């Protein structure tokens, strides 16, 4: 079967289980990643380099689609500090290494199974009369480059395209439908948000901040800056060359 559909089916089976207390369902789809297998020794191997496989029913769905690139497409950041110019393990930008339109289309087609899966889970919650009493959070771990800054098929530098990701929250008792706040939020804000929405008291052990005041339009003194760090060897090498 198609792994996105399998994960969706397992999630729905979990939702259907009889229970007398609230539940937490966390589902992390592998869709948008290339076609890989895990060997018995734990190694993860690409079985088709750059091979992005949509569900059979979605193959060719966007075959004629052309995705507009951003104005900074193909412009290498040579005026930036060495830390921001490239990832050492990646080849330089060029006709052979640039992200192809086919790759972008196939990844968009892969997303269709994710979209359908979320819809099926919401339909099941509605059938069980749980939908409006369930907090639904949809987000990602990072963005991607498709030629922006002269960088391709990566995300390990702190550019806007890599660090600014979707965060969608549905919870009618607290979140106004159609609202689009522009506050700067982080993934570490999710834990205190869910704890507060569940009716529990917050402690100073949380690194993040609850988003409930944003939902209620009562936020004060929200953050205006963030620190981005990553464990990539590239970063450490460049910092060392800068005297750190």
Regions inferred by a protein language model and the residue ranges of each:
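Active-site-proximal cap/lid insertion segments
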Residues: 2-6, 12-21, 26-185, 197-205
């Amino acid at each position: 079967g198609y792994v996105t559909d399998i994960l969706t089916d397992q999630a729905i089976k979990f939702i259907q289980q009889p229970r007398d207390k609230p539940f937490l369902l966390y589902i992390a789809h592998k869709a948008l990643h290339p076609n890989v297998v895990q060997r018995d020794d734990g190694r993860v191997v690409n079985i088709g380099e750059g091979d992005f496989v949509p569900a059979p029913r979605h193959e060719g769905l966007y075959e004629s689609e052309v995705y507009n690139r951003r104005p900074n497409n193909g412009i290498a950041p040579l005026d930036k500090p060495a830390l921001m110019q490239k990832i050492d393990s990646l080849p330089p930008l060029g006709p052979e290494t640039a992200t192809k339109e086919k790759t972008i289309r196939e990844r968009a087609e892969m997303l269709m199974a994710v979209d359908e899966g979320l819809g099926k889970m919401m339909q099941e919650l509605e059938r069980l009369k749980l939908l409006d009493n369930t907090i639904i959070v949809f987000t990602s771990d990072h963005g991607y480059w498709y030629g922006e800054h002269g960088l391709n098929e990566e995300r390990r530098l702190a550019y806007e395209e890599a660090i600014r990701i979707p965060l969608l929250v549905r919870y009618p008792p607290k979140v106004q439908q159609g609202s689009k706040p522009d506050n700067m939020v982080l993934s570490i804000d999710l834990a205190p948000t869910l704890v507060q929405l569940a009716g529990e008291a917050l402690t100073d052990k949380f690194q993040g901040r609850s988003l409930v005041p944003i939902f209620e339009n009562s936020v004060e003194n929200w953050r205006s800056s963030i620190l981005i760090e990553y464990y990539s060897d590239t970063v450490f090498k460049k910092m060392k060359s800068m005297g750190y």
